[in-house]
């Protein structure tokens, strides 16, 4: 089992709007699943080397490499998938043609094939993840308890995963089509869960909702929603109501400052504090409204806090700990 919420899932696909922190959440998820001596593999497919930056390590090659040890002795490995190398892998795995593939690369055919046909590129990238899932069936192979794929953003996630549909214009039959069908057999199964990362802002939430509907339309398995960078609420409902009604005045804040013996110009400070309080209240109302829209999806939700010190390896450990506390096991 990889988690109590998704007991049959071997492949966790993580997507999100740009800037929502999907790579951070993918890395923390890999850490959370690498518990009690388990091994997870964290994969990226966009060529950004975001994983290497998070783990403060050298750029990842097209080779599985350990990047962290999880609490309890688990391990997190990482892999940056290159479409050209994945095509060479495909030629070698199914046709024993790696040497021929190397010759094709020299002629520029490999680059041409992976650039001119985006459907082929996606089936190669997703195919590598699915090959690693199926590797568990091979005796003696290095296997993982869970694979976490840092996938493209929400605007492209359904097309990226719907490899048979996107490849239909390129190949209706033949080996590439059979390979796509094999890949789809993993992606559309209970072995896979697609998780979405969002912020409590209107556009990221709308993209998340649209992505969930699109994934459902393609019968792709949706996992949970990770609400990232959540700020602590400074006011309770009663205090929010007082701010909204204008009941809290500058004079009241001045009295509080003087009672607390805060030095400086009390009235000027009170005006600034009250303005900031109204801004925070506005932000809280926005976040509450967007959170309600996420709740309406009826999916498991994980609220991840904004880290005051930024995201580093220590921050990943903290996010992983919070994920486990919220039900990921």
Predicted feature descriptions by range:
Residues 7-12:
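Pre-Walker A (Motif I) flank of P-loop NTPase domains
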Residues 15, 43-44, 150, 195-199, ...:
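Conserved beta-strand segments of the P-loop GTPase G domain that flank and frequently precede/overlap
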Residues 6, 33-36, 70-74, 137-142, ...:
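Conserved catalytic network of the ASCE P-loop NTPase/AAA+ motor domain
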Residues 98-210:
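Phosphate/Mg2+-binding loops and adjacent switch elements
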Residues 15-81, 161-164:
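Walker A/P-loop NTP-binding active-site region of P-loop NTPases
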Residues 64-105:
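A conserved catalytic-core segment of Leloir-type glycosyltransferases
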Residues 1-6, 188, 192, 202-329:
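C-terminal lobe/tail of nucleotide-utilizing enzymes
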């Amino acid at each position: 089992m990889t988690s109590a919420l998704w007991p049959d899932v071997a492949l966790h696909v993580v997507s999100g709007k740009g800037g929502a922190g999907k790579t951070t959440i993918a890395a923390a998820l890999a850490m959370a699943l690498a518990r009690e001596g388990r091994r997870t593999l964290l994969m990226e497919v966009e060529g950004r080397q975001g994983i290497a930056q998070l783990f403060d390590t050298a750029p990842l090659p097209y080779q599985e490499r350990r990047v962290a040890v999880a609490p309890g002795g688990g391990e997190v490995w990482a892999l940056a998938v290159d479409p050209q190398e994945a095509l060479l892998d495909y030629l070698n795995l199914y046709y024993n043609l790696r040497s021929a593939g190397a010759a094709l690369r020299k002629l520029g055919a490999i680059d041409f094939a992976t650039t001119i046909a985006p459907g082929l590129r996606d089936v190669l990238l997703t195919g590598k993840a699915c090959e690693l899932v199926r590797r568990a069936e091979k005796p003696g192979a290095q296997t993982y308890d869970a694979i976490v794929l840092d996938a493209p953003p929400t605007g492209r996630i359904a097309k990226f995963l719907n490899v048979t549909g996107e490849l239909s214009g390129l190949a209706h039959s033949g080996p590439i089509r059979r390979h796509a069908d094999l890949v789809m057999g993993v992606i559309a199964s209970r072995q896979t869960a697609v998780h979405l990362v969002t912020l409590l802002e209107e556009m990221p939430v709308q993209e998340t909702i649209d992505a969930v509907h699109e994934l459902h339309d393609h019968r792709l398995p949706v996992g949970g929603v990770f609400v990232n960078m959540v700020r602590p609420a400074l006011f309770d409902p009663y205090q929010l109501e007082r701010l909204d009604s204008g009941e809290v005045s500058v004079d009241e804040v001045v009295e509080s400052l003087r009672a607390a013996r805060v030095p400086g110009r009390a009235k000027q400070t009170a005006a600034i504090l009250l303005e900031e309080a109204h801004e925070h209240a506005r932000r809280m109302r926005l976040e509450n409204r967007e959170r309600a829209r996420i709740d309406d999806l009826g999916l498991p939700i994980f609220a991840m806090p904004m880290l005051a010190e930024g995201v580093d390896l220590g921050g990943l450990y903290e996010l992983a700990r919070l994920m486990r506390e919220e039900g990921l096991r």
